[in-house]
């Protein structure tokens, strides 16, 4: 079923059709219209504005954002899902920039190899979004899903996305009859972010385990697993054996580290040592993820952590969490189930 949904969606996408892409109910729980940027037309942009009603954005890779000199919209991103907005833009030759034609013109420029940063003015009416390297395997958002679709379809990694709102202005949620009726009415295929995660996991991997050894960690004997990701960064999992070990649903604690394995200055210091006591007593996994941000002392890319758990053969797990942690969402595509959250 998943393979069929993905292959049919990719075929439609590479033929210039829009898709409805939905994320998990425990995340944004939204349906977005998604269109490959190279197939943008004024008519399709008008359709998004008229029928989807949300904010029209353009997802693209970090390389393209750098090429067009599109810096982040803010220096510290503290939005709920850390959506990576850049400064907004218009095509330089646009008048107001808001018409469907002029928004299409801006999108068209983002898709051309010859476009220069000076071809845009800032701010504007198109909102670029930078997709995480690694796509949905690094961050389970519509931004990454739309760029992944372009890459899987062999298209330039620029995608137009727009949230779908109901006629009363409320968001169209996954499971709403509105979205299924919308898809039927406009003859649109539907795809889930979890479908893309499953599809990519079947065909590629961002993570490889290259070392497994017994190692003492803070005066406790553990099994240490070392992983290398697609950016040549190391991530580590320490398995603790406790008196009350639950192999079917082990305890898991995620914690950020810096390149030099510095884990004591990356935030959640008190919670870290509380988690350590749980792990020593009950067993489980302490996973160090090399995704630390100097601006926000939190683990930002849960996708890597999910891949570590998947590589370790974990399916169900119990999360050791603290108020400094953000929620871990969109797990279904990784074959994981969070069965309990233990507050620290």
UniProtKB/Swiss-Prot annotation:
Mg(2+) 1 binds at residue 28. InterPro entries: DHBP_synth_RibB-like_a/b_dom, DHBP_synthase_RibB, GTP_cyclohydro_II, RibA-like_sf. One of its GO terms (biological process) is riboflavin biosynthetic process. Pathway: Cofactor biosynthesis; riboflavin biosynthesis; 2-hydroxy-3-oxobutyl phosphate from D-ribulose 5-phosphate: step 1/1. Mg(2+) 2 binds at residues 28, 142. D-ribulose 5-phosphate binds at residues 27-28, 32, 139-143, 163. The keyword Transport does not apply. Gene3D superfamilies: DHBP synthase (3.90.870.10), GTP cyclohydrolase II (3.40.50.10990). Its cofactor is Mg(2+); Mn(2+). It catalyses: D-ribulose 5-phosphate = (2S)-2-hydroxy-3-oxobutyl phosphate + formate + H(+). Keywords: Lyase, Magnesium, Manganese, Metal-binding, Riboflavin biosynthesis. One of its GO terms (molecular function) is 3,4-dihydroxy-2-butanone-4-phosphate synthase activity. NCBIfam families: PRK09314.1 (NF006804), ribB (TIGR00506). In the N-terminal section; belongs to the DHBP synthase family. This is 3,4-dihydroxy-2-butanone 4-phosphate synthase.
